[in-house]
A protein has these predicted regions:
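Ser/Thr-centered flexible coil motifs
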Residues: 49-51, 232
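Short Gly/aromatic-enriched secondary-structure transition segments
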Residues: 52-66, 204-208
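Short acidic, low-complexity intrinsically disordered linear motifs used
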Residues: 36-48
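P-loop NTPase motor catalytic core
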Residues: 1-25, 29-38, 68-274
Length: 274
C-alpha cells in the first residue's frame, strides 16, 4: 500500500478460481489470528440454485458457517444416495470435516448491504484518503461473483445493489460533503477485460492487446486504456452497462451465460486544491 497522495484509485475485480481445501485443522484447533494486515479475505456462501434443488441427485449442503468465529467448515460426510431405480448415485464416505478461518464469513442469506458495510466501506475510505485499494471477487463460475460485485437484477432492486454501485455512491457522497470553492474533485473510470491472456478496453473495443507498464508518476498502469471523466453515479452505471455488453461470455456446465473473461473496473479520484 502506498503513502497517501492526492490521487487515489479503486479497482473492483471479478476473477474466477476453484476453492479447494487441503489438509487443514479441525474446528477445535482453529484460532483466529489477531493482527493488522493490508489484506483481508472474506467468504460469502451463496444459496442453492433452483436447478441444484431440482436435479436428479438430491442436493446436499456440506458447508457450515460460524459467523461469530468467522469459521467455514466443509464436511466430507456423504450419505448414500439412490435414484428412482434404486441404483447408488453416491456412496458413503468417511465422516470428516475441514475448518477454515477468514477475516469474515457470510452465510447464504447475508444481504448486499451487510457485505458492503463490513467488507468494502473501509476499503473505499482508504482510497478516499489517498491509498490505492482493490476489492477482488474470487470464485468458480456460478458462485455469485457478478451478483456480489454488481448486484443489479432484472427488477433493478435497490437492495440488490452490489459492491461497485455502493462504492460509487460512497465516493460521490464524499465529494458532495467536501467540495467547496477552494477544493474540487475529478473522477475518472476505466473498464478492461483479460481474456485468453490479452487485455482489451471494454469501453473502446477496438483497443486490444494492451500492455501493462510502470513508471514513477503513474505506478502500474495499462498503456492505452481509455479513461472517462464521470460526474455522477448514473454516468458510471452507464459505462458499466456499456462495457458489460461487450464482455466475452459463453456457456459452461455451471452457467449458461458464464463470463469467460476477468474484468476490472477502475475508478480514479483526484482532489485539487486544499
Amino acid at each position: 500500500m502506498r503513502a497517501a497522495t492526492p490521487r487515489s484509485s479503486l479497482n473492483s475485480s471479478q476473477m474466477a478460481q476453484s476453492f479447494k481445501g487441503g489438509g487443514s485443522p479441525t474446528r477445535s484447533s482453529v484460532s483466529r489470528p489477531e493482527r493488522q494486515t493490508n489484506f483481508k479475505v472474506v467468504v460469502r456462501v451463496r444459496p442453492p440454485l433452483p436447478r441444484e434443488l431440482s436435479g436428479e441427485v438430491p442436493f446436499q449442503n456440506v458447508v457450515a458457517v460460524n459467523e461469530s468465529d468467522q469459521v467455514l467448515t466443509i464436511s466430507e460426510n456423504i450419505e448414500s444416495v439412490v435414484d428412482a431405480r434404486g441404483q447408488a448415485l453416491a456412496t458413503p464416505g468417511p465422516h470428516s470435516s475441514h475448518s477454515f478461518v477468514f477475516d469474515h464469513v457470510y452465510e447464504q442469506n447475508a444481504s448486499q448491504k451487510s457485505v458492503y458495510e463490513t467488507t468494502a466501506r473501509a476499503v473505499v475510505d482508504s482510497a478516499l484518503q489517498g491509498y490505492n485499494a482493490t476489492i477482488f471477487a474470487y470464485g468458480q463460475t456460478g458462485t455469485g461473483k457478478t451478483f456480489t460485485m454488481e448486484g443489479f437484477n432484472k427488477e433493478g432492486s435497490i437492495e440488490a445493489r452490489g459492491i461497485i454501485p455502493r462504492a460509487i455512491e460512497q465516493v460521490f457522497g464524499h465529494i458532495q460533503r467536501h467540495a467547496n470553492p477552494r477544493m474540487r474533485f475529478l473522477v475518472r473510470a476505466s473498464y478492461l477485460q483479460i481474456y485468453n491472456e490479452a487485455i482489451s478496453d471494454l469501453l473502446k473495443p477496438d483497443r486490444s492487446n494492451l500492455s501493462i507498464r510502470e513508471d514513477k508518476r503513474r505506478g502500474v498502469f495499462v498503456d492505452g486504456l481509455s479513461e472517462w471523466v464521470v460526474r455522477s453515479p448514473a454516468e458510471i452505471y452507464g459505462l458499466m452497462q456499456r462495457g458489460g455488453a461487450v464482455r466475452a461470455t459463453g456457456e459452461t456446465k455451471m452457467n449458461e451465460v458464464s463470463s469467460r473473461s476477468h474484468a476490472v473496473f477502475i475508478v480514479i479520484a483526484e482532489q485539487v486544491g486544499h
